[in-house]
UniProtKB/Swiss-Prot annotation:
Keyword NAD annotated: yes
Protein name (record): NADH-quinone oxidoreductase subunit C
PANTHER family: NADH DEHYDROGENASE [UBIQUINONE] IRON-SULFUR PROTEIN 3, MITOCHONDRIAL, NADH DEHYDROGENASE UBIQUINONE IRON-SULFUR PROTEIN 3
Family from the record: Belongs to the complex I 30 kDa subunit family.
Tree of life domain: Bacteria
Length: 214
């Protein structure tokens, strides 16, 4: 680990000492985890002002709904029963606390350092965080993409609309409970002279099963 990276980490940790934040250096990268999602805007504003993180390079999210679950059973049980077969799992789509994590990538050109700031959204009933588009204009479209793909809402966003999917699209494609086939398919209807949307007829199945070996 470089002493310069450690120096940046120590200085930023001191700046954030008054908040519920945990930091670490792993694989040559600095990461800070915010405990309370209500502090996201205030913490990022402080980082921009006091450590000159003038660029927000990305905002993204992770859905941990199926984290640690395997499509095939492996291990000692396999020798007795054989492999289980890949099949579409029925996930519980009810609200799950800590299911989503939002991630911000920041760059300080003045200090020549990048950091990652992330936060688990603990309240599954309210998947809402404050927008940081007032701090960085680049957050505008990035937050729209996170909303479109994951269904995470951003409070005080100036124009929170879908940005990647079509008008009237149902669901959020990067959620783990979103079917790989989607919900509808489209085709051109010669009689109507336009594109029509119909319920998808493809069976949703697992072609490449996820296997977790302990």
């Amino acid at each position: 680990m470089s002493t310069k990276l450690q120096d940046h980490f120590d200085k930023i940790t001191k700046i954030l000492s008054g908040f519920g934040v945990e930091g670490c250096i792993s694989y040559g990268e600095i990461t800070f985890s915010i405990r309370d999602q209500r502090d996201i805007h205030l913490i990022l504003k402080k980082l921009k002002k006091e450590y000159l993180f003038e660029q927000l390079t990305d905002v993204t999210a992770v859905d941990y709904l199926t984290y640690g679950q395997s499509d095939w059973q492996v291990g000692k049980v396999v020798s007795q029963t054989g492999f289980s077969r890949g099949r579409q799992q029925d996930f519980k789509t009810a609200a799950v606390d800590n299911r989503f994590e939002i991630i911000y990538q920041l760059l300080s050109m003045a200090n020549n350092v990048r950091i990652r700031v992330k936060c688990k959204l603990k309240d599954a009933q309210i998947i809402l965080v404050d927008s940081v588009s007032d701090l960085w204009s680049s957050a505008n479209w990035a937050e729209r993409e996170v909303y479109d793909m994951f269904g995470i809402y951003f409070n005080n966003h100036p124009d929170l609309r879908r940005v990647l999917t079509d008008y009237g699209f149902v669901g959020h494609p990067l959620r783990k409970d979103f079917p790989q086939t989607g919900y509808v398919e489209m085709r051109y209807d010669e009689n109507l002279g336009r594109v029509v949307y119909e319920p998808v007829e493809i069976d949703d199945r697992v072609n490449t099963p996820r296997v977790i070996r302990n």
